[in-house]
Amino acid sequence: VLEEKFRLGLFTDPYVDPERAVKIVHSKAHQELALQAAREGIVLLKNEKNLLPLGKNLKSIAVIGPDADNALNQLGDYTPSKVLQPVTTILEGIKESVGPQTKVVYAKGSNILGDDKSGFGEAIQAAKSAELAVVVVGEEFGESHTTNREDHPTDGEGYDVASLDLTGVQGDLIKAVSATGTPTVVVLINGRPLSVRWAAAHVPAIVEAWEPGELGGKAVADVLFGDYNPSGRLAITIPRSVGQLPAYYDSKPSKAYWINHGWTHLDGYVEMPGSPLYPFGYGLSYTQFQYSNLRIDPPKIRAEGNDTVYVDVQNAGKRPGIETVQLYIHERVGPVSTPVEQLRGFQRVALAPGQKKTVSFRLTPKDLMLLDRNMHWVVVPGAFEIMVGRSSADIPLRGTLDVERSGGPGTSGENNGDPDR
């Protein structure tokens, strides 16, 4: 922090120029950046039968849920109780995206905490009268100074929950709306993984919006109506249940790993699969991408050498889109147990329909190092599995990189030092 302050000159000139601050803070460029960040962060988790994107010629849409018209919750934790800039809620974003021929009806339905279902009737009626329902649920952010649990935030520093399920009766609200038979889209507002098993099994479309910020309502609407093709990918693993915690993609080969790969007749727990609800790196698009022609050049290197991985990616759909190509590695044999896969690079590639591009990744000794039993960072000679795919669980292309022993210092078991230096 001190180095950054020195770099910015804050020790010699610690004061800001008020006139310049007025021009810069919340400028048009900053608002556009906030919108783009929200768009790119949204992850499409489910889209059964291509329910999304929606047509803007719908006659009626029901927007339901405690986070549908909640500006503060879109801003996340550590948000002032009084927000000076305007915030576009998801309800407002949907209203602004449709024409006058589309009737948008809003019903809160429930609170985020508590067991009050008195708003269910209004929500059910709104869903029944609409062509489509958008249910916006998730978490409560902010600060509370009361002992009433129902007035507390559910996410943020100092606020813990005992379950990863939706709090209060929000899960029941989704079920009630879905039971009307009206096609339903669930939008999540949250800062931690939510185990939405029922929705994942029964609701045709789920959009993970996180804490999308002041223009989050427009960003979500842009995704819902196809003005922006979703390209976000999960930077976390979403478990099916709190019983799966800790849940992360780069685990060591364990009983759970082998069970998930057919070691027993069970595929995980007695009650549910052992795989996550949504894996690390996962995210859908409104188009399809095909991977081909994996090349590892050269296929064999010395421990101190560099390597390049190439893959061809093609947009096989009818819409322009952005694919996030991910590179994972795994050392098959080594002196210590290594993770089943480790992310070593990713690239966002924009592709027009039918367009194909070659994506390349550079692998250096730092990428291949492991911490040995002597607590030294080393590159251990052997076979490395090279995996390129759409997520940690969707790997269409695999290859092998052979690393040979080198006579030089700092390789094959000798101390390489800190790989981050």
Give the location of each predicted region.
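C-terminal non-catalytic regions of proteins with extracellular/luminal or membrane-system context
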Residues: E3, I24-V25, E32-R421
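Flexible, acidic loop-helix segments that line cofactor/substrate-binding pockets
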Residues: P14-H30
